[in-house]
Amino acid sequence: MIDSDGFRANVGIIICNRFGQVMWARRFGQHSWQFPQGGVDDGESAEEAMYRELYEEVGLKPEHVQILTSTRSWLRYRLPKRLIRQDSKPVCIGQKQKWFLLQLKSAETAIDLNASGHPEFDDWRWVSYWYPVRQVVSFKRDVYRKVMKEFAVTTLPLQVKESNNRRRGMRRS
């Protein structure tokens, strides 16, 4: 769905583990890494699109994750001119995204990048929380920064809790 301003409705998905690290995925056959994301189909809610994209891109089902939060509003980014398809109607000049923060509840083995038979990613890894903001392609950086800042209040306590648990476990009597 492309709105009257030329922005395609899209969902972004950030999956975190119990340590507050986030899943970072490499686009199939490329050297670029990003969070899973995808378009919202006509008649589909943002949450429905998120679950569909979650399965298509990383093979996870609703029972594998827990929704921790979502962005309060839709965030937009413009595509660089070289990526805008002028011959398509309506012309899409960028994405407007509703972001979801999910916690992985199942084992990592549930992640299957080839679940749909048409992989969008060919590798993934856990990275520190702020790492993606510095590493994503430049035209998505501002949206990533806003999303990560909004979600930090939810995710960073996971890191603090785990860090405290590790310290307690390392004490010697």
Curated annotation (Swiss-Prot):
Which gene does this sequence derive from?
Answer: rppH
Write the Enzyme Commission number(s) for this entry.
3.6.1.-
Q: Name one GO cellular component term.
A: cytoplasm
UniProt motif Nudix box: location: 38-59
Q: What task does this protein carry out?
A: Accelerates the degradation of transcripts by removing pyrophosphate from the 5'-end of triphosphorylated RNA, leading to a more labile monophosphorylated state that can stimulate subsequent ribonuclease cleavage.
Domain of life per record: Bacteria
Q: Name one GO molecular function term.
A: mRNA 5'-diphosphatase activity
Any one GO biological process: mRNA catabolic process
Named cofactor requirement(s): a divalent metal cation
Show where the Nudix hydrolase domain sits.
6-149
* NCBIfam families in the record: PRK00714.1-1 (NF001934), PRK00714.1-4 (NF001937), PRK00714.1-5 (NF001938)
InterPro entries documented for this protein = Nudix_hydrolase, NUDIX_hydrolase-like_dom_sf, NUDIX_hydrolase_CS, NUDIX_hydrolase_dom, RppH
Look at the named UniProt entry and state the broad enzyme category this protein falls under.
hydrolase
Q: Which PANTHER family match?
A: M7GPPPN-MRNA HYDROLASE
Question: Which protein, by its recorded name, is this?
Answer: RNA pyrophosphohydrolase
